[in-house]
Structures are given as C-alpha cells and as structure tokens.
UniProtKB/Swiss-Prot annotation, chain A:
The keyword Transit peptide does not apply. This is Dihydroorotate dehydrogenase B (NAD(+)), catalytic subunit. It catalyses: (S)-dihydroorotate + NAD(+) = orotate + NADH + H(+). Its main location: cytoplasm.
Curated annotation (Swiss-Prot), chain B:
Keywords: 2Fe-2S, Electron transport, FAD, Flavoprotein, Iron, Iron-sulfur, Metal-binding, Pyrimidine biosynthesis, Transport. The gene is pyrK. It comes from Caldanaerobacter subterraneus subsp. tengcongensis (strain DSM 15242 / JCM 11007 / NBRC 100824 / MB4) (Thermoanaerobacter tengcongensis). [2Fe-2S] cluster binds at residues 210, 215, 218, 234. GO terms for biological process: 'de novo' UMP biosynthetic process. This is Dihydroorotate dehydrogenase B (NAD(+)), electron transfer subunit.
Length: 301, 247
C-alpha cells in the first residue's frame, strides 16, 4: 500500500500534514503523537522580527468552529532557526515553514534566510496586510500574488507553496497568478474573515474587531475552493479547512488535493492527525486501493 | 507520551445554585495542585473546556464547575456511569513552598483548585479565606485543613464584605499567598502582597482552544525587562507569580 505523495521536491510518506498556526513548532504535540508519522509539519507563521501578537481575548468559539485573533505571535525567523529547528530536525518528517511579511522585501529576506538544511518548503502566507498598499492583503490581488511568488521563487531552492486566502471574489484567478509566479504548490484555504460581539459590553469580542474563522463550519467553502483551484492549475494543491476526520480528508483528496492539512481539529483532539492517517489506510484496505494516487482526483462529475 | 483518557462518572451533584461537584474515576497521571483537565462536553461545544482539579485521591478526581453555557449545562446532566473524555492534567500548578505561614484565598467558583492545594501544602500555619457573593459552597471541606474565614458580599453568611479585606488584615502574618478567583480579586491580591513584600501566586483563567500551548490563544500579559510579553495561561500558567502579571 502506497500513501506517499509528492509536493514539489518534498516527498511525504502520507498526505496528512499540519496546518500552520495550529501546531506551534511541534513540541507540544510531540507529547501526544509520534511526529515521525506525519506527512509533513507546517510550523506557525514566522516574521522577520519577533511579534507579541494581539492582546487577549484571542479566541471565540462559534457554532462548529472558532474565531481567532492571535496576531501572528512568533519568536521571529532567527530565533526559530536557532531554537526550534534543531528540535524539528530530530524527527524524520519534512519541515515546511510558513512566512508572513509586511512587504515583499520581508518575504524575500525570510525565504533567503530559510534556504538551509532541515527545511524542505516555504509556505507564503499571502493573507497578510501589505503595509505599502494601505494594509490590503497581498492575497486579494493577483498581481501581488504573482510578484511575491516570483521573487520568493528566485530567493530559495526549497519547494515554494502559496497559501491562498478565501476572502476573494475569484479564487481561480489568484491560484493561476501563483502558478504563473513559479509556485511549486498551492495550499488553501486560510481563515474566513469573521466577527463576534460581546453583548454585555456591546463591543467586538476582539480588540482587532475582525478575526479568522476556522473549523468544520468552513469545510464546504474550503472544499469548493479546492475543487475550483484543482481545475485551473497543474501544480499540486494542499487542501485544508475544517478537516476533522479521515472522511473529511478523503473528500479533499477525491476532489483533487494532493495532500491535506489538519488545523483546528488539533485543538479538539491532539491525536487527530494520526487518526486520520489510520482512517485513510483502513478505507484503502476496505476498498482494495493500493495507491493513494488512485484516490486523488478520482471525483466523478 | 500522553494518552486520551476515558473516565467514568462516579457522582455529579449540585452543591449551590448553578454550581456542581463531579467526581470521576481517574487512572491517569496524578495531578499537581493548580493543574487542570480539558474535558469534552459531549458534542455540545466545539472546543473542550478547561476545569481545575478540585480534589484527587486514590483514583478519584473531582472538579467543581459553574453552569455558564451549553457545555457546562451538558456536564451538569451527566449521571453516574456516564463516560467523560479527558486530556490532562495540564499546566503549571502552584509552586508549594514548605514550612511557611500560608494564606489561601478563593473567590466564588475560583475556590475550585484550592481544596487540593490546601490538602497538599505542608504549611507551618494555614489560613484559608473564602469569598462569595451570597451563597457559599464547599466550605465544610476546607474546615479542618486550616483556619477558615468566610466572607459574603451581601453578608448572608460569615463576614460581610470582600474577601480581600480579610487579606489586608492578615497579610502581615503570612509568608506566602495563593489565590484563585475573579480578576478584580487577583489584582487586589497582587497589590496587597507587593505592598507588604509577601510572596503571592495566582491562578488565571482565559479562553482556551488547544489547552497544551500550541495555539497561543490563551495569552496573558507578563512583565519583562523591556516591557512585556504574552505567556500561555494553559502551559506557562495557569499559576503565575502575582508580581509578573500585568492586568
């Protein structure tokens, strides 16, 4: 039975990876699961300099999901390389680093810095506000997606993955811009913009007002967008958004995702990644499927 | 490696309006005072809920909880024999210093982690101050562990007023304070203890998602040499030295 898939230059032992921002740098979950079993680990988003993140509260539970306003708290790219990467290298699992910048120059700087041993891929978080364009997210403008992808592509020898935001009118145009820019793969979706109000204080729950919605509530949106993107690009697509079990994962694979990322489910069930891998294996056994690639893109319309 | 635990409910009873005490079998790791469990609220909520360890002895764990929403409402309806799904114990509990004159201060349902602490602290002298609004609960379990003072804001039982007024009176007679309760109480404990140059540890609360330190959702602002940083209530806490917390 073969569960191995390839994303750019990265060979994954199975299609189940962790979503950025939900797995820290792996330390906490290593107490619960064998990290070696994962297809890959995408670590929390890094910025050039350390970021404290947003003041609390940062979380709000919704029906079948959560709103978060973490604010990209992270120790910065240098501290990651010095303190976290050595830990991750002790496992036999590809490490993909998510990068978040305020300018294209920052993305390029980090891509160059992270072109080192122990890192297999760079995931570009284009959902960040572009401070040179009044805070508009890079990811809503295809030209910006193209520009940032092209420049990051030049800056690193690693597999380049562009993570798309769903808060756009036409995801297909954005995906094509990333592919044209030289991306090796596309991952989607990032969180859906949302909001909640504290009825006692009559104020937004978050100081930042807007938060990111994730969880099973957004899975239909994610699946639809993955389906759309798969039909317009040739490069591999990594699907994510509300995956809670192996059945959800299979839906994304059947639609055409080459791999899936598990995010918010990690909070609810720290064992869910390995449970999903086991569930996929069982499904393959029961249906006498020898190769995961027989499942990928097998949807019948 | 940590494992998901299934625990059988042994008893679940209401001990005050909207306050319940649940005891269940526990064959997992022995908790340290101040640690908490993440309990699945049986599909009524998306996220697990954090609950302080109220008491533990010989494979029996007890939690104290107030019904506030769908999750705790669902818990309150569980019966003997029902099965809970739990991860934990989580977090950094109270640092117990032996041989000290200790004051334990609890407010409302915040007294939850303090019973187990009171049993485990090896104090030279133990004072326990419990503050409530009107209705008291669990006081009888603290009797016999130390010298207990009860306050109610409405004066319905014990001394009328805030529990912090008791702390102000007693702070000169103790070496360390342990507190858990509403934020205004904890802030007052910080002020009183710092002014008197007395050690103080407080247990904080914050909305949580993962409960193990990975998502950075339960941020708590703490003093740093050059300003502040955010620590995780679930992993760096829930217990912090009072002097480091920025309210």
């Amino acid at each position: 039975m073969n569960l191995s898939v390839e994303i750019g230059k990265i060979k994954l032992k199975n299609p189940v990876i962790t979503a950025s921002g939900t797995f820290g740098f792996g330390r906490e979950y290593s107490e619960y699961i064998d990290l070696n079993k994962l297809g890959a680990i995408v670590v929390k988003g890094l910025t050039v300099k350390p970021r404290e993140g947003n003041p609390p509260p940062r979380l709000f539970e919704t029906a079948s999901g959560i709103l978060n306003s973490i604010g990209l708290q992270n120790p910065g790219v240098d501290a990651f390389i010095e303190r976290e990467l050595p830990f991750l290298k002790s496992f036999d699992v590809p490490v993909i680093v998510n990068i978040a910048g305020e300018t294209v120059e920052e993305f390029v700087y980090m891509a160059e810095k992270l072109d080192i041993e122990g890192i297999e891929g760079i995931e570009i978080n284009v959902s960040c506000p572009n401070v040179k364009k009044g805070g508009m997210a890079f990811g809503v403008n295809p030209d910006d997606i193209f520009d940032i992808t092209r420049k990051v592509r030049k800056a690193t020898s690693k597999t380049v993955i562009v993570k798309l935001t769903p808060n756009v009118t036409d995801i297909k145009v954005c995906a094509k811009a990333a592919e044209k820019g030289g991306a090796d793969a596309i991952s989607l979706i990032n969180t859906v913009a949302g909001m909640a109000v504290d009825i006692d204080k009559r104020r937004p729950v978050f100081e930042n007002v807007i938060g990111g919605l994730s969880g099973p509530a957004i899975k239909p949106i994610a699946l639809k967008m993955v389906y759309e993107v798969v039909t317009v690009v040739s490069i591999p697509v990594i699907g994510m958004g509300g995956i809670m079990n192996y059945k959800d994962a299979l839906e994304f694979l059947i639609v055409g995702a080459r791999a899936i990322a598990v995010g918010t489910c990690n909070f609810v069930n720290p064992y869910c990644t390995v449970e999903i891998i086991d569930g996929i294996k069982k499904y393959m056994e029961e249906n006498e499927i020898e190769d995961i690639n027989e499942i990928i893109g097998s949807i019948k319309i | 490696m940590r494992w998901k635990m299934k625990a059988r409910v042994l008893s679940n009873r209401r001990i005050a309006s909207e306050v319940y005490e649940m005891t269940f079998e526990w064959k997992g790791k022995k908790p340290h005072p101040g640690q908490f469990l993440m309990i699945d609220c049986q599909g009524k909520t998306f996220l697990k809920r954090p609950f302080s360890v109220n008491d533990f002895e010989e494979e029996k764990m007890t939690i104290l909880y107030q019904v506030r929403g769908e999750g705790t409402k669902n818990l309150s309806q569980m019966k003997e024999g029902d099965i809970l799904e739990i991860t934990g114990p989580h977090g950094n509990g109270f640092e117990i210093l032996e041989g000290k004159r200790v004051l334990i201060v609890g407010g409302g349902v915040g007294i939850a982690p303090l019973l187990y602490l009171a049993k485990k602290v090896k104090a030279q002298k133990l004072y326990i101050a419990l503050g409530f609004k009107r209705e008291t609960f669990l006081v009888e379990k603290f009797e016999g562990l130390g010298e207990v003072v009860v306050t109610t804001e409405e004066g319905s039982t014990g001394r009328k007023g805030l529990v912090t007024s008791v702390v102000e009176e007693m702070i000169g007679e103790v070496d360390i304070v342990y507190g858990c309760g509403p934020k205004p109480m904890l802030k007052a404990l910080q002020e009183i203890s710092m002014k008197a140059n007395v050690l103080c540890q407080i247990s904080l609360e914050e909305k949580m998602a993962c409960g193990i330190g990975a998502c950075l959702g339960c941020a708590c602002k703490v003093r740093e040499d050059k300003g502040f940083s955010y620590k995780r209530v679930c992993r760096d806490g829930p217990v912090f030295w009072a002097e480091e917390v920025l309210f």
